[in-house]
Design a protein with these regions (language model features):
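Conserved catalytic cores of very large enzyme subunits
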Residues: 1-183
Length: 183
């Protein structure tokens, strides 16, 4: 009865989805913690390499409490520690498989990832992979003119001219409004 009243008072919006069981729309798991500590619940060990890291992330995305993942993390920040420990071409191959799987496994979800504002090898490779594969997965560059290198920003601009992404986010304003850990 209380829930029905909240629906009638427009406190709760059903998003025109009908009488489906309630589940959160947007969740923000701590993916960094998952990679560093693993998950007893999902029987995942801490990631030791890029293969482990991408497998753990895909597993976590699959079991998102919202049914579909929405924000899949600051991927360059999450993956760079693993990318930087392997040959670039090998890392590129793993990232291609990962990005393709994200695109194919969650085609009907508004899935998005962030990179930047710092330039990392993982961020540069993800831009390269995205440009090559032309997937629909959303990608945003957290841009900060005092931090983001011009060549990294230009790589993102070249992608945007071909793919209409990455999107550019004013990182300093977001930090000002929401703090360093915004999503």
């Amino acid at each position: 009865a209380a829930a029905q009243k909240m629906i009638e008072d427009e406190v709760i919006c059903l998003l025109s989805e009908g009488p489906a069981p309630f589940h959160p729309r947007y969740t923000a798991p701590n993916y960094k913690r998952l990679l560093e500590q693993g998950s007893a619940f999902m029987d995942l060990k801490p990631a030791e390499n890029l293969y482990d890291a991408t497998a753990s992330l895909l597993t976590a995305y699959h079991y998102a409490p919202s049914g579909e993942p929405v924000f899949i993390g600051r991927l360059d920040d999450l993956l760079d520690p693993y990318v930087s420990r392997m040959p670039e071409e090998q890392a590129l191959a793993v990232l291609k498989n990962f990005w393709l799987l994200v695109d194919r496994l969650f085609p009907n979800a508004f899935v998005h990832a962030d990179i930047g504002p710092e330039a990392t090898l993982a961020g540069r490779l993800l831009l390269r992979v995205d440009r090559e594969l032309k997937t629909i997965t959303n990608l945003t560059l957290r841009y900060d003119p005092s931090v983001t290198p011009v060549d990294f920003a230009l790589q993102a601009v070249e992608n945007a001219l071909q793919l209409a992404k990455p999107y550019f986010l004013n990182h300093p304003l977001m930090v000002q409004d929401w703090g360093d850990d915004y999503i």
